Amino acid sequence: MSSDHRDQYYWRAKRDQFRSRAAYKLEFLIERYGIIKDGQAVLEIGSSPGGWTQVLVDHGCRVVAVDIQPMDEIPGVIFLKLNILREDAAERIREEMARSLVQRFDVVLSDAMAKTSGIRSSDHAASVMIGNAVMKIAMDTLRRGGVAVVKQFQGDMTGDFIKNWGHYFRDHRITKPPASRKESSEVYIIFYGFSGKETDNSVQG
């Protein structure tokens, strides 16, 4: 196997016993942007195979993990096999919150992504669709002041995506972790300081 940029993270994940190299993307987001604090309640969307989940557990977080694909059990983690594009996705998650005595999540994280086609415009559009579904769930499950993080293939709809959802939050950042493939348009959009659904949607001049 070649020793290119991607393989460095592959072998690091093996050494550190992470289920995927994506764990280092989340570690970067935590260290650089402070997106979670130890012990917080976190909704993780797109969790399988569990690399991010392992990092969250290492930080003592209470995790509800969601994915359309199955995921091997991680002690202390609640897993829901669920398609977030379903109309009742938010309701299913709220039901689990009630069972788990979680009133609201401190953080909503998403590493969810559709299978890529290799057609940049199509992959971008699919990532925006998933991102919108994630943010709709965040509107119903995130506490005021909370943080939402969404993965997206950056493209011509990214600006509108940030504009549409950004007015529910105090601030945002866009970043590409070092563990992301250099040739990929993958970015993570971080929204800070959720103000709640009932907010002033007027355009500020």
UniProtKB/Swiss-Prot annotation:
InterPro entries: RNA_methyltr_RlmE, RNA_MeTrfase_FtsJ_dom, rRNA-MeTfrase_E, SAM-dependent_MTases_sf. S-adenosyl-L-methionine binds at G50, W52, D67, N83, D111. The active site is at K151 (proton acceptor). It is found in: Cytoplasm. It is an enzyme of class 2 (transferase). Its main location: cytoplasm. One of its GO terms (molecular function) is rRNA (uridine-2'-O-)-methyltransferase activity. HAMAP family: RNA_methyltr_E. Specifically methylates the uridine in position 2552 of 23S rRNA at the 2'-O position of the ribose in the fully assembled 50S ribosomal subunit. This is Ribosomal RNA large subunit methyltransferase E. It comes from Thermoplasma acidophilum (strain ATCC 25905 / DSM 1728 / JCM 9062 / NBRC 15155 / AMRC-C165). The lineage of its organism: Archaea, Methanobacteriati, Thermoplasmatota, Thermoplasmata, Thermoplasmatales.
